[in-house]
Amino acid sequence: MLKTTLLFFMTALCEIVGCFLPWLWLKRGATAWLLVPAGVSLALFVWLLTLHPAASGRVYAAYGGVYVCTALLWLRFVDGVRLSLYDWSGALIALCGMLIIVAGWGRA
């Protein structure tokens, strides 16, 4: 379970970075060269999703829970926004959903 969660976390970071770099280019006028590492990051994101032993739809559903938590960590530490009780509650619910789905991988 820990290995799966860490792999999902790495996957989420790749997805967020791959989307954040073009955002910097479009919204903040950063160099278009950021699109190169963004493309690499998104390709790595896709590859990491293929490393899980479950059906793709089940992997995507479980990944969503970790993505929510990772995005909120990004909000806190990159964007500098303090998380609310609603943020923490939503993250906990999403993570519980992920844990339930992953726990059932071998039983489905």
Swiss-Prot record:
It is found in: Cell inner membrane. Disulfide bonds: none annotated. InterPro entries: UPF0060. It is a multi-pass membrane protein. SUPFAM superfamilies: Multidrug resistance efflux transporter EmrE. The chain crosses the membrane at residues 6-26, 29-49, 61-81, 85-105. Keywords: Cell inner membrane, Cell membrane, Membrane, Transmembrane, Transmembrane helix. GO terms for cellular component: plasma membrane. Coiled coil: none annotated. Belongs to the UPF0060 family. This is UPF0060 membrane protein CKO_01576. It comes from Citrobacter koseri (strain ATCC BAA-895 / CDC 4225-83 / SGSC4696).
